[in-house]
C-alpha cells in the first residue's frame, strides 16, 4: 500500500497521471497554476520570500522564469517550487453518465430525440503542452499570449524555456458534455388513405445522428 504508479507519458519524461491507494484511478497529477508573472519586480518579490523562507539568500521561487511565465502553487509550503509541489488536478472518470430520450406525436407526425452526456470528469489537453519552436506552426491560442500590452490572459508568453510546458492545471479542462445523439422524424399515413391502395400501414421517417 502507498505506492504511486505514474502513467500517461507525453514525452520528455512527463507523466500526466498517477494511481495510488485511496485516490481515483489515473487522476491527473501536476502543478497548480495560480497566475502569470507580470514583471521582474513580482519575480523578485517571490524570490525574496523564497530566500527568507529557506534561509538561502540565492533561493529562487521558480527557476528560469521571466515576465509572462506561469506561477505554480507552493503546495508543500517550503517556499519554492519542486516536484513535490505537484498535486491531484482531477479525475478523468465521470461522476455521472446518462442519457435522455424525448418523444412526441401529433396528427400522424412523431418525433424522437435522444441526448447523451457525462459530467464531472476532466481531460488533459496534451496538444497545448507542445513546446513552441520556430519550425512549427503556431497554435491559434498563441494569438492571446501574454505580452506587456496583453497582461490579462492565462496563455503564457511564447518561449523555448520549458517552465510553461510542465504538466499543470493550465492543460486540464472540463470533460463534461451533452450531445444530441439521434433525431428521428416520422409520419404515419392515415389508414383511410392506405385502404384505398390496399396497404395496411405506411410510415416514412428521416433520422440522423
Predicted segments, located by residue:
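Repeated loop/turn-to-beta-strand initiation elements of outer-membrane beta-barrel proteins
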Residues: 108-113, 192-193
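Hydrophobic, lipid-facing positions within transmembrane beta-strands of outer-membrane proteins
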Residues: 96-102, 109, 180-185
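Outer-membrane beta-barrel domain signature
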Residues: 87-91, 171-174
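Conserved small-residue
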Residues: 1-90
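Flexible loop/turn segments at secondary-structure boundaries
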Residues: 1, 110-112, 119-123
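C-terminal beta-signal and terminal closure region of outer-membrane beta-barrel proteins
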Residues: 13-43, 140-154, 163-167, 196, ...
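Extracytoplasmic gating/loop element in the C-terminal half of outer-membrane beta-barrel translocons
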Residues: 67, 118-207
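Outer-membrane beta-barrel pore domains and translocons
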Residues: 1, 105, 116-118, 207-209
Amino acid at each position: 500500500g502507498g505506492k504511486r504508479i505514474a502513467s500517461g507519458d507525453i514525452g520528455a519524461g512527463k507523466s500526466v497521471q498517477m494511481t495510488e491507494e485511496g485516490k481515483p484511478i489515473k487522476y491527473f497529477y501536476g502543478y497548480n497554476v495560480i497566475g502569470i508573472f507580470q514583471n521582474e519586480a513580482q519575480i523578485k518579490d517571490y524570490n525574496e520570500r523564497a530566500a527568507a523562507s529557506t534561509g538561502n539568500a540565492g533561493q529562487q521561487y521558480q527557476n528560469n522564469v521571466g515576465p509572462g511565465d506561469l506561477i505554480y502553487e507552493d503546495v508543500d509550503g517550503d517556499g519554492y517550487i519542486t516536484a513535490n509541489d505537484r498535486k491531484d488536478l482531477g479525475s478523468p472518470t465521470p461522476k455521472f453518465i446518462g442519457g435522455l430520450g424525448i418523444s412526441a406525436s401529433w396528427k400522424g407526425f412523431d418525433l424522437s430525440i435522444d441526448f447523451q452526456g457525462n459530467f464531472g470528469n476532466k481531460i488533459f489537453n496534451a496538444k497545448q503542452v507542445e513546446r513552441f519552436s520556430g519550425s512549427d506552426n503556431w497554435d491559434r491560442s498563441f494569438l492571446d499570449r501574454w505580452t506587456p500590452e496583453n497582461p490579462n490572459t492565462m496563455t503564457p508568453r511564447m518561449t523555448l524555456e520549458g517552465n510553461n510546458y510542465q504538466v499543470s492545471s493550465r492543460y486540464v479542462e472540463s470533460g463534461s458534455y451533452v450531445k444530441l445523439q439521434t433525431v428521428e422524424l416520422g409520419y404515419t399515413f392515415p389508414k383511410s388513405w392506405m385502404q384505398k391502395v390496399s396497404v395496411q400501414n405506411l410510415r416514412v421517417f428521416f433520422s440522423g445522428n
